[in-house]
Amino acid sequence: MTSPCSPPLKPPISPPKTPVPQASSIPSPPLPPSPLDFSALPSPPWSQQTPVPPPLPLPPPPAATGPAPRHVFGLEKSQLLKEAFDKAGPVPKGREDVKRLLKLHKDRFRGDLRWILFCADLPSLIQEGPQCGLVALWMAGTLLSPPSGVPLERLIRVATERGYTAQGEMFSVADMGRLAQEVLGCQAKLLSGGLGGPNRDLVLQHLVTGHPLLIPYDEDFNHEPCQRKGHKAHWAVSAGVLLGVRAVPSLGYTEDPELPGLFHPVLGTPCQPPSLPEEGSPGAVYLLSKQGKSWHYQLWDYDQVRESNLQLTDFSPSRATDGRVYVVPVGGVRAGLCGQALLLTPQDCSH
């Protein structure tokens, strides 16, 4: 099967970049103010007649109550994000969010199959501007460099210094792999030729073992995959998969008490890997994904993701005329994103 992108099996090590469109330069964002250096402040006048009393001790910090604050990069600069943050309810924990999602979509699942859920817990992070790829990498980094990965600001800084991005955008899967290896210290395997064929089994086995997958795709209005020829190119991270199987292996799985027919691997217990659904079996594989415009997991049909990823060929006309600079590899979106994805594993992992 041929794809419309026909990417090379191995990406070039150092592809030159072509800025699109023309612009002189992008001003660097202002540096945050440095903390006050109290030792540099002038000492108050001293007198034998009026001794200065010692300062009162600071009150103890308030006790932490409720869930930890959500990660929102750019909240201090964006009024829109502030308003959305204030109106939003608490973010559910990973497993609670997945359970909510499965209950919401239970009518989509084939009744002739049993379902096994493999899902690593990912944090959420809301992007600011065209940072979807770096935000997806940050989320993946929490599984690769525990306990909390690396700061998003560092990913942005290194990507900018290496010439991978001008303002947070990432139009090259190969560059994303180089960035992940350098900053997260992980292994990065670039898949080309689409998510079907032999790559399909690689992806599913990767997700079953709990490792993250970075996927470029075209984003619809509800953040789901669509087909816009790359005009809505976006990034997501998947760290979970829902498999429809004829029979659940007897070793290491337990049925969900609230959703009959759904099984989970038992933590801390060896489990027999399930047989992967055959390619071409409709509605048998779903990816659990997150992306930088929502707090929540999303459930996507694997074939829908594969088709969206395989048609990323053109640079968005609206971006080409917005007066900003974007770093695009030689060969454009077709060469940088089409039919490609990134498998990430910890450095010490033999998988």
Swiss-Prot record:
EC number: 3.4.11.-
Residues at the active site: C132
Residues annotated with Phosphoserine modification: S316
Cellular component terms per the entry's GO annotation: cytoplasm
Keywords, comma-separated and alphabetical: Aminopeptidase, Cytoplasm, Hydrolase, Phosphoprotein, Protease
Start and end residues of each stretch annotated as Peptidase C39-like: 124-244
Regions of compositional bias (Low complexity) in chain numbering: 36-50
PANTHER family: ACTIN MATURATION PROTEASE (PTHR28631:SF1), UPF0692 PROTEIN C19ORF54 (PTHR28631)
Domain notes: The N-terminal proline-rich disordered region contributes to the interaction with PFN2.
Protein's name in the database: Actin maturation protease
Organism of provenance: Homo sapiens (Human)
Gene encoding the protein: ACTMAP
